[in-house]
């Protein structure tokens, strides 16, 4: 188990293709950018099966929302990280992620990479997926602690990843690296790949 943890930590420090991140399409569906009122309507987070990265997933295609229609209020201690975020400062510059939340559950998607989890501190309900496109298999326990989302690979004491709000921005610590992200309000249709994806899906505004 320790050797697997070391492997994951090495992956966190591996090379990053910022140009590929910057060129990849952002979510083209305007609904992805909305943050609806969490009024308790719809299914509960527990009634929706855990999602995962599908075979053949890539940065180029974003899957449908996992928690669509679930309006369960956020758990105590959970920051509201919902929306689409773009990293503008730090090692992961250009990276974009879509965050869905309901109850004690959070789904973080980058292109077709889906990390879906309940933040109850267990491996059983945490991430059971790949670390990244072409990455090693990982199992991660997740928690919300005093407004911070924390990820512990293999439920060890080491907190490998955190996300928290800082004003209107997100601070994302990925291994030893600190990144800042801004929340996007709508699809950036001036971005070539995003515009092409929207045109292909017929979601371009009139």
Language-model segments: residues:
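Amphipathic/hydrophobic helical signal segments and adjacent flexible N-terminal regions
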Residues: 2-112, 184-206
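Short, exposed beta-strand-loop hairpins at the edges of beta-sheets
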Residues: 170-176
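A short beta-strand motif that forms part of the nucleic acid-binding face
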Residues: 155-156, 176, 185
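Contiguous, well-ordered beta-strand patches that form the walls/edges
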Residues: 90-91, 111-165
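Short, solvent-exposed coil/turn segments at beta-strand boundaries
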Residues: 81-84, 99-107, 119-127, 143-148, ...
């Amino acid at each position: 188990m320790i050797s697997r943890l070391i492997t994951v930590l090495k992956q966190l420090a591996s090379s990053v293709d910022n140009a590929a991140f910057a060129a990849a399409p952002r979510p083209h569906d305007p609904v992805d950018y909305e943050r609806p009122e969490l009024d308790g309507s719809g299914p509960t987070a527990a009634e929706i099966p855990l999602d995962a990265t599908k075979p053949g997933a890539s940065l180029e295609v974003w899957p449908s929302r996992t928690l669509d229609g679930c309006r369960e209020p956020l758990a105590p201690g959970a920051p509201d990280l919902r929306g689409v975020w773009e990293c503008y400062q730090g090692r992961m510059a250009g990276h974009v992620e879509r965050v869905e939340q309901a109850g004690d559950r959070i789904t973080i998607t980058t292109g077709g990479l889906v990390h879906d989890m309940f933040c109850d501190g267990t491996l059983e309900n945490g991430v059971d997926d790949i670390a990244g496109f072409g990455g090693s298999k990982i199992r991660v326990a997740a928690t919300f602690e005093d407004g911070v989302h924390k990820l512990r690979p293999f439920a060890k004491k080491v907190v490998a990843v955190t996300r928290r709000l800082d004003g209107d921005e997100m601070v994302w610590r990925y291994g030893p690296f600190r990144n800042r992200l801004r929340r996007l309000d709508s699809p950036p249709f001036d971005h070539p790949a995003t515009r092409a994806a929207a045109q292909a899906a017929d979601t371009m505004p009139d």
